[in-house]
Design a protein with these regions (language model features):
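Walker A/P-loop
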Residues: 219-260, 325
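Basic, amphipathic alpha-helical bundle interface domains used for macromolecular binding and assembly
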Residues: 33, 39-44, 59, 66-76, ...
Length: 515
């Protein structure tokens, strides 16, 4: 007898319908065709044991499974549930009437219980687009999938519940989530606040500019100057996620299996801080079965690279393309996929191997060659893509011991939001452009042209500091953001001067090291 169930395959951060055809006929054996991976082929034993433990007999006949479309790789153990249901339906243990109306996905344990899966959110979106009646999946993923409106989400614990529901023997209660209420609930909740930061007003100002325009930033300073502490507070001054950004961010983390159980929507911008031993594949994504990397997990948030020169040269260089295009393409022999990668890069580093070159109190023990070699680990093209390059000085005792609180993140965030609102209105007719950091050269000419005095100062800096054309564009973008923070329509000379001051590493000789 032929039975059909509906499953899904994740491709990038979207899901594709997979139809699973099962025939149970005379003979013996179990065969799965349709480009399954090893985990899918191994499902026979998991399904057999799960069925036996829940009171069903595995058919003593030939079971043939065909998964279509056949040109898409079927990966993982999440196909256990639709395979088991298809086999039971082919063996006339389940009515066929309701099979084609539900999406089924879930990994089976040997006792017949269901284990969580990856990619439940994009699968639920696909099910709604196909106008299916509902999505039956493990209970642990129900809240995640329930953010999709106009689709019934049935979280179940075991195979028996699914069989009884499809046979009309029991009713399941659909999981419901008020998406907008969930989205609003956790807005503005941050574990770290800039009020805790003593001194460092110039660095806090640079962070404000970076967040207001979506600019990348590099902090250079000795150990203990507060680089990492301030970077961790960055999400607290970034503009809140929009609902569409929250959904897209949650989809990426769903595909990667990074959502905590019971999570509905990610309402705070992600902050990813990979270790410097990370591989290029782990950073940008890929692998035998492509998965999002750290730069995609940081989408709509912050990617913090602490001790930047300690990362391998290959790791740093693979970031150049996604930093420019805000998307990462993974190509394989038979297919390619794309992951979004619109993140704000925040990096920190010491000025030299010992960390104390230029320190007001501690002596550097490095020679000029060591300093030059250390700084040369970061290529010029990568530095060009970092809009703000800030020197972080140690905090003196008077500032550190002061009991006066610093400016709270909430106050800084309000100024950032006001500047972003100006940019949203400015770029409302420009598809794919949301902030100043994303401006194209034509938009720079249109919106960031400085006044005559500013242009003269920029020309002088370009000649004196031997800047590249990309650095020229970055300065104009940052100057436009500074003007937005002031609420001025024109880019003036003092905006240009402040933007140039944020290009520390563009100086011909920085801290004794030629770059």
């Amino acid at each position: 007898m032929l039975a059909r169930t509906i499953g899904a395959a994740v491709h990038g951060i979207d899901a594709i319908k997979v139809e699973i055809e099962v025939t149970v006929d005379w003979g013996s054996g179990f065969m799965v065709i349709g480009l399954p991976d090893t985990a899918v082929k191994e499902s026979a034993e998991r399904v057999r044991c799960a069925m036996q433990q829940t009171g069903f007999d595995f058919p003593g006949k030939k079971v043939m499974v065909n998964m279509t479309p056949a040109d898409i790789k079927k990966e993982g153990s999440a196909y256990d549930l639709p395979l088991a249901v298809g086999i039971l339906a082919g063996d006339e243990k389940i009515n066929l009437d309701r099979l084609g109306r539900y999406l089924l996905m879930g990994e089976l344990s040997l006792d017949g219980s269901l284990r969580p899966i990856k990619g439940a959110l994009p699968m639920a979106i696909m099910a709604r687009e196909l106008h299916l009646d509902g999505f039956i999946l493990p209970r642990a993923n129900a809240m995640e999938a329930a953010v999709v409106n106009n689709l019934k989400i049935y979280g179940v614990d075991n195979l028996i519940e699914v069989v009884q529901f499809l046979n009309g023997e029991i009713d399941l209660t659909a999981t419901e989530v008020d998406t907008r209420a969930e989205f609003a609930k956790a807005q503005g909740v941050f574990p770290y606040d800039f009020a805790d930061v003593k001194g460092q007003e110039n660095v806090k100002r640079a962070f404000e500019v970076a967040c207001a325009g979506g600019h990348n930033i590099l902090l250079v300073g000795s150990p203990g100057s507060g680089k990492s502490m301030m970077a961790k507070r960055l999400p607290s001054i970034m503009p809140p996620l929009t609902l569409s950004e929250a959904l897209e961010t949650t989809k990426i983390h769903s595909v990667a299996g990074k959502l905590q159980q019971g999570t509905t929507l990610m309402t705070v911008r992600p902050f990813r801080s990979p270790h410097h031993t990370i591989s290029p594949v782990a950073l940008v994504g890929g692998g035998s079965y492509p998965m999002p990397g750290e730069i995609s997990l940081a989408h709509n948030g912050v990617l913090f690279l602490d001790e930047l020169p300690e990362f391998s040269r290959n790791v740093l260089e693979v970031m150049r393309q996604p930093l420019e295009d805000r998307i990462i393409s993974i190509s394989r022999a038979k297919y390619s996929t794309e992951y979004p990668a619109s993140f704000m890069l925040v990096a920190s580093m010491n000025p030299c191997p010992c960390g104390y070159y230029g320190h007001p109190k501690k002596k550097c023990v490095c020679n000029e060659y060591q300093r030059t070699h250390y700084m040369s680990k970061i290529s010029g093209p990568l530095l060009d893509r970092i809009d703000l390059q800030i020197e972080v000085q140690p905090v003196d005792f008077d500032q550190m011991s002061s009991k006066a609180p610093g400016e709270p993140s909430a106050a800084i965030r309000q100024r950032v939001i006001a500047a972003r609102m100006l940019q949203e209105r400015r770029f409302k007719d420009e598809p794919g452009i949301h902030c100043n950091a994303q401006m194209t050269p034509s938009l720079l000419h249109k919106y960031a042209e400085p006044n005559a005095a500013g242009l003269e100062k920029l020309k002088d800096a370009m000649e004196r500091m031997n800047m590249s054309a990309r650095a020229y564009d970055r300065i104009l973008k940052v100057a436009r953001t500074i003007a937005d923070l002031e609420g001025t329509a024109d880019v003036l000379d003092h905006h240009i001067m402040e933007a140039i001051a944020y290009r520390n590493l563009d100086r011909p000789t920085y801290m004794g090291s030629s770059l």
